[in-house]
């Protein structure tokens, strides 16, 4: 039986270099899905590219740790009105305002539908914040209400003791294609690991990009260019097929 592989490029809309990299990896490589950051400065550029390449499925990358929120979020923003990674401190202290988060989720979803002209194919999140135990039930209920698939990290489920209510998702998710020591063999090892789990659908996260001034300020910069080179390698797609996988998206879940 042919297995489903979703190669999802996160951070669509982050900057033009990221946007162009994702499109290149879709057109000339194995990226088969992407997720858009609705509060990013170059989201309109992403929507223009999406209109040029409508075959690329686009989901929503829910953001609570970067940029400015679309709604008032005094409990999660600093003096400059910016979101940040201090969300984990607030979560650990039990001070997250779930009403604020729910309103921001709804607003990001509504903006997605407005600018892309359709609902997202699925939902995931920046820095995997939707897998935090306080936030997951809220996002899972929202996805269920909207009849949308959701990225599920089974390691986070086990770590936090989360209860899954049969969400639409891939059977396995792997965030391992990330970091300094990336290669085509390391990508293919993720498929082999999924086979060891006995699953028939796998999502792999990636961040292919061309480097621009925005990404030069990111803590994860040059590996994005390495990702792009690997994901557009002419030998990768045949190697994926040889292992019994077909490329697809959350529309296939």
Swiss-Prot record:
Keywords: Carbohydrate metabolism, Chitin degradation, Cytoplasm, Hydrolase, Magnesium, Metal-binding, Polysaccharide degradation. GO terms for biological process: chitin catabolic process; diacetylchitobiose catabolic process; polysaccharide catabolic process. It comes from the Bacteria. CDD domains: YdjC_EF3048_like. It holds the Pfam family YdjC. GO terms for molecular function: chitin disaccharide deacetylase activity; deacetylase activity; metal ion binding. Involved in the degradation of chitin. ChbG is essential for growth on the acetylated chitooligosaccharides chitobiose and chitotriose but is dispensable for growth on cellobiose and chitosan dimer, the deacetylated form of chitobiose. Deacetylation of chitobiose-6-P and chitotriose-6-P is necessary for both the activation of the chb promoter by the regulatory protein ChbR and the hydrolysis of phosphorylated beta-glucosides by the phospho-beta-glucosidase ChbF. This is Chitooligosaccharide deacetylase. It comes from Yersinia pestis bv. Antiqua (strain Angola).
